[in-house]
From Swiss-Prot:
It comes from Phaeosphaeria nodorum (strain SN15 / ATCC MYA-4574 / FGSC 10173) (Glume blotch fungus). It is found in: Nucleus. Required for replication-independent chromatin assembly and for the periodic repression of histone gene transcription during the cell cycle. The keyword Cell membrane does not apply. InterPro entries: CAF1B_HIR1_beta-prop, HIR1-like, HIRA-like_C, HIRA_B_motif, WD40/YVTN_repeat-like_dom_sf, WD40_repeat_dom_sf, WD40_rpt. Its main location: nucleus. This is Protein HIR1.
Length: 1044
């Protein structure tokens, strides 16, 4: 053995050489890379090192010096294919370089991988370079894609610093060593180049935890660099102990035994920090080729060990003692070792700044076996084979069909990202083609309206178009138009407005998922308000106060001690205090609806005739004894509502003609009495005047004996609610279509959609009627369950409950309510129960929350052909309930962030994920969230969303490998396609699920699952049933195999 240590082979400093922490050899054996405390990654020529004694050698010694870290570099590793070089440092960043510019040694950083919260201690590449794994002092094991360098998974199973990583040469496992005195072995399947974090949720699973050899191991080592033998059968674990003695534990593959009977390498006086197996197998004797052309001699492996005792030992599997032991090889601890690919050159680094090279004579370690012998040995562990075996031609054909459909989807998304395709489809809103308005409308109010009218939730309200909108011009024409846009400055000079690069792109929203908890108000362009999106919800004109409509209740939850009596009339005094400062939120009624007093004061300056608040509404006696009490609107002087739900436009003057501009919108106006009583008695006030106008001309008018609190209407009818609880309805021509309907308390919310009319009273009762059929789908229902009445304590005191952000209707008469605590509810009229559709729990626990996947965010009508023109508050059958689930989830995000609870719940979830027993928490919550979405879409009858969410759910089940759920889901989609003999023939299932044929949904699910070979025993029978795999295809496949 020759020891080579050139003087120039260092990381020089001003006073002394820097400590060298890591080294590695390139797969071609030509380069040595070292990393040290100077923040440099230096690449050396191995040929120059071996010829350092030759003064005639003139070739470059140092090939490159790369400095892209701000601190000490602890680990540096070449990828197995030699294409990349990864380095990890105490700046918690891994830089990846590439040598794709031969023949000059030009190493450039192509990606900075940020994922650790503390120092990165070690790195490792898989045998096929498909993944890079980093470990650090933050106790994390982070898996990165070796192709895209996206983070695939973070493993938080360790409880202390992780200081070593090694990969199985058979490419099935990797092992990590930690200061929690364990080695954890993880099983993985090599991910494809286009793998994403969501695809790999069921990959990289913990296989085994080894603790026995490390129970008394010291925690003073800087590294715990273990190594996997080239035959894949053993792991050499550093910093183990055998009784009181430091040792290297040899762990057996498969059993992972850490028992006292295991093999231990004993001889070092201090803890061993690094072990390194030679990458080659060796014969002890000169190999002899037998008559069959093979070599039948046994092979041995060679392992080098070093650590804090500054000694280096080399062992093989035959000798009980090291066949080489060096004393005082370095002045300080040896930190890393690396073998050359030929297995006969060893490089070592130490904290004294030394970089050592040991060259062994031929036969000194043994006689190297060929690389084919390595592959032959590893083949028994499945090296070179993909997990899962095709079980017949049907499974192969199903897999090909699945991948073909997936490829088409990828090509379509890439085409969208690159701006391919023809003319853009005209926007389809609420089932009818329309022209995109210049301003975004929310609940009938323009985004340019004063801030005094808060909108409870986003809802598009595009203006109806008299004719179908023309197709948009090609992308290049739109770009030219943007380039030529001229603006006028304050000084009157004309200039061409600068154009953002992003504004000229014809590319739509990216279809790549980006899941994060963000407020919809902070997203660019207010994507939730985009008129291209379909939202099947009514557009109430009267807004809600900030924080939602105030509600108070007396809970159902009983206390341990009952409080009897209310002699001091505390209930009445608390109710009166609710309108004073310090009580419940006080809101004023203006012409624009319910607004805060401060906003009303600022708005009064620019309104000619503001709507005055005359007085509070008369309180119904039922309100004082009700468990639920909602804030009652005050009596306003003027209340208006347009037929299309848009913001009422005030009369203006045309700047060009000087003539008055009169809006042509049909508008209902209610004017309550403002003067004094004509008889002298307060109760003898003038009647309320109801008038309907269009283009400034009266269409009809009527009078009501009581003051009006709320009005609503559309193209089918108008309605007004009075302070005595009565509701009146008129046809568009002014006919009273039914007698006055009397409620049990004052109305606080009234809304309409199509022929449906909804009214919520002050005692929390929700009424809904169909004015076309003069019927109700269900009896009046109470809002008490969704106001958390079951969680509040029963007693004489009123309790503040969550406010109502909005209560609206869809075109099918389904009631949708959003709360200020972030929860969203829908009333199921078939089951007579409230169902929670959205809640903050999903926002921090699910990986699918707030996804920007275009298939979820921009749900558009499936009808590309021009549909007949429909009324503004109607949608086509395909778009019933469209957009309701995303709207409720956006409200959840906004309210959750507004209250500040997101930060603390996210901390709780982060702590749970790393806790024992919660390893599958994030995965389970994500699957449950998708199941919740699928069930919600089915309940609402949201056709497009149901198919999208079902597809996402099936993909996740396939990635998780949940065979039980998959089989149950496929069977539920089958319906009557398969009938068991013991099933009753009279019970038949519907062929349609949420507007889709069962066979179509089943076929899509089978094609999605077809690429998972471990699920093909479940999916192949369904593929045969659906005709995805036909007899002709099987014969063609068999003929092809025969020809081969």
């Amino acid at each position: 053995m020759h020891l080579i240590k050139p003087q120039w082979l260092t990381h020089p400093g001003d006073l002394k050489d820097f400590e060298v922490y890591s080294c590695h050899v390139s797969p071609d054996g030509s380069r040595l890379v070292t990393a040290a405390g100077d923040g440099y990654v230096r690449i050396w020529s191995i040929d120059a090192i071996l010829n350092s004694h030759d003064p005639e050698y003139k070739k470059p010694k140092q090939l490159a010096a790369v400095s892209h870290h701000s601190g000490t570099i602890h680990a540096v590793r070449f990828s197995s294919n030699g294409k990349y070089l990864a380095s990890g440092a105490d700046d918690k960043i891994k830089g990846t370089g590439t040598n794709e510019a031969p023949p000059v040694e030009n190493w450039r950083v192509i990606r900075r991988l940020i994922g650790h919260d503390n120092d990165v201690q070690d790195l490792g590449w898989s045998a096929d370079s498909s993944i890079l794994v980093s470990v650090g002092l933050d106790s994390k094991v982070v898996v990165w894609s070796g192709h895209s360098f996206e983070k695939l998974k973070t493993l938080s199973n360790h409880q202390s610093h992780v200081k070593g990583i090694t990969f199985d040469p058979a490419n099935k496992y990797f092992a990590t060593a930690s200061d929690d005195r364990t080695i954890k072995v993880y099983r993985f399947n090599s991910p494809p180049p286009n793998a994403t974090q969501q695809d790999q949720v069921n990959n990289f699973v913990l296989e085994h935890t080894i603790t026995t050899p490390f129970l008394t191991s010291p925690l003073t080592t800087y590294f715990r660099r273990c190594s996997w033998s080239p035959d894949g059968a053993h792991i050499a674990a550093a910093n183990a102990t055998n009784g009181p003695v430091s040792s290297v534990a040899i762990l057996d593959r498969g059993t992972w035994d850490g028992q006292p009977s295991q093999t231990s390498l004993i001889g070092h006086e201090g803890p061993v920090e690094v072990t390194a197996f030679s990458p080659r197998l060796f014969y002890q004797q000169q190999p002899r080729v037998e008559h069959d052309g093979n070599i039948h001699q046994p092979t041995v492996t060679v392992v080098a060990c070093a650590g804090q005792d500054k000694c280096l030992s080399i062992w093989n599997t035959v000798l009980a003692r090291p066949f080489m032991m060096t004393q005082e090889l370095a002045a300080k601890s040896i930190t890393d070792m690396a073998w050359a690919p030929d297995g006969e050159k060893l490089f070592a680094t130490s904290l004294d700044g030394g970089i050592l090279t040991m060259v062994f004579e031929p036969g000194e370690l043994g006689f190297p076996a060929s690389l084919a012998e390595n592959e032959k040995t590893l083949s028994k562990f499945g090296a070179g084979r993909r997990v899962g075996i095709i079980e017949g031609t049907d499974a192969l054909l199903l897999e090909e069909s699945s991948k073909s459909g997936e490829l088409k989807g990828v090509q379509g998304r890439m085409g969208a990202l690159m701006g391919d395709g023809g003319a853009v489809q005209p926007p389809i809103t609420n089932g009818a083609n329309g022209i995109v308005p210049s301003t975004t409308l929310t609940n009938g109010s323009s985004s340019t309206a004063p801030a005094a009218a808060p909108a409870p939730a986003p809802a598009p309200a595009p203006a109806p178009a008299p004719a179908p909108a023309p197709a948009e011009p090609p992308v290049d024409q739109r770009v030219e138009k943007l380039k030529q846009r001229v603006t006028v400055t304050k000084e009157g000079k004309k200039r061409i407005a600068p154009m953002l690069v992003s504004s000229s792109s014809g590319v739509g929203t990216s279809s790549l998922p980006q899941t994060q908890l963000i407020s919809a108000k902070t997203t660019s362009g207010a994507r939730s308000d985009n008129p291209h999106n379909i939202l099947d919800l009514s557009k109430p004109y009267d807004g809600f106060p900030k924080g939602g409509l105030a509600s108070m209740l007396i809970g159902n939850k009983r206390k341990f001690a009952e409080i009897e009596g209310d002699e001091d009339r505390q209930v009445e005094r608390r109710l009166a205090a609710s309108v004073r400062p310090g009580g419940a939120a006080v809101v004023l009624n203006s012409e624009s609806g319910l607004i805060p007093p401060a906003a009303a004061a600022s708005k009064s300056n620019d309104v000619a005739e503001p709507s005055k608040v005359l007085r509070p509404a008369i309180i119904s006696p039922s309100l004082s004894v009700s468990q639920v009490r909602l804030a009652v609107p005050k009596v306003r002087s003027v209340i208006t509502r347009t037929a299309d739900g848009s913001e009422p436009q005030r009369n203006g003057v045309d700047a060009n003609t000087g003539k008055a501009e009169i809006p042509d919108t049909v508008m209902l106006e209610a004017r309550n009495a403002t003067g004094h009583s004509r008889t002298g008695r307060a109760q003898d006030h003038d009647p309320a005047k109801i008038s309907c106008t269009s283009k400034g001309q009266p269409l009809w008018q009527d009078f009501l004996p009581k003051s009006v609190l709320l009005v609503t209407g559309n193209t089918n009818f108008f309605a007004a609610a009075c302070e005595d609880g009565s509701i009146y309805a008129w046809s568009p021509a002014g006919r009273r279509t039914l007698n006055a309907m009397v409620l049990d308390a004052q109305p606080v919310i009234m809304d309409c959609r199509g022929w449906w009319l909804m009214c919520i009273s002050a005692v929390g009762m929700c009424h809904i009627w169909n004015l076309k059929t003069m019927s109700a789908p269900h009896p009046p229902i109470s809002l008490a369950p969704i106001l958390d009445i079951a969680a509040h304590t029963q007693g004489p005191h009123l309790t503040r409950s969550p406010g109502i952000v909005f209560a609206r209707l869809n075109s099918a008469g389904c009631i949708v309510v959003a709360m200020s605590n972030g929860e969203g509810y829908v009333y199921n009229s078939s089951m007579y129960i409230w169902q929670r559709i959205s809640e903050p729990w999903w926002s921090v626990g699910s990986q699918y929350w707030n996804t920007t996947d275009s298939s979820v965010s921009n749900i558009r009508s499936s009808q590309d052909k021009a549909a007949p023109k429909e009324k503004d508050d109607q949608v086509s059958i395909e778009n019933i309930s469209a957009g309701i689930i995303p709207a409720l989830e956006r409200n959840t995000t906004n309210q959750f962030l507004l209250q500040g609870r997101a930060f603390y719940l996210q901390r709780l979830i982060k702590a749970l994920i790393s806790a024992e027993g919660y390893e599958t928490f994030e995965s389970s919550v994500s699957v449950a969230h998708l199941e919740n979405r699928v069930a919600a879409a089915k309940t609402l009858g949201a056709r497009e969303e149901f198919k999208i969410y079902l597809s996402m759910y099936v993909k996740r089940l396939g990635a998780e490998g949940l065979k039980g759920k998959i089989e149950e889901l496929l069977r539920s989609l089958t319906g009557d396609l398969i009938v068991e003999e013991d099933e009753e023939s009279g019970e038949q299932q519907e062929e349609i699920i949420c507007g889709w044929k069962r066979e179509e949904l089943l076929k899509e699910a089978v094609l999605i699952l077809g690429k998972h070979r471990d699920l093909q025993r479940i999916t192949v029978p369904y593929a045969r049933l659906l005709g995805i795999v036909t007899e002709d295809q099987r014969q063609d496949e068999q003929a092809m195999i025969t020809d081969m």
